[in-house]
């Protein structure tokens, strides 16, 4: 199924922070692209080889909280474990009492010589300017990270 999303993701200007807009024909694809956008802020995800897989599961009552926990968990994965994920990410989103993401990220241990460094260090996820909406036939996830 194709849709008319403008891109997988894009960045916007924001004082001392970075605004990210991730797009997807489905919510799952938008959450995947939000993860790739986060990675590409610090290193070059296209250089990552799928040598290992990490499972990530997060849940929350609403989609905004789920997005916050998703990005926050990915920041922890990179900061604490030095795991660099590439663009091969499987995301399953379920709705019940709340929302739950079960994901598998394929990647390898971060190596600055291989994966590079863009010059940005993402410090934290914020709720500032967060927005999740459906536009025509695609989803937009907007979030701001502190750098």
UniProtKB/Swiss-Prot annotation:
One of its GO terms (molecular function) is calcium ion binding. One of its GO terms (biological process) is tRNA splicing, via endonucleolytic cleavage and ligation. Ca(2+) binds at residues 17, 146-147. InterPro entries: Archease, Archease_arc, Archease_dom, Archease_dom_sf. Keywords: Calcium, Metal-binding, tRNA processing. It comes from the Archaea. HAMAP family: Archease_arch. PANTHER family: ARCHEASE (PTHR12682), PROTEIN ARCHEASE (PTHR12682:SF11). This is Protein archease. It comes from Pyrobaculum calidifontis (strain DSM 21063 / JCM 11548 / VA1).
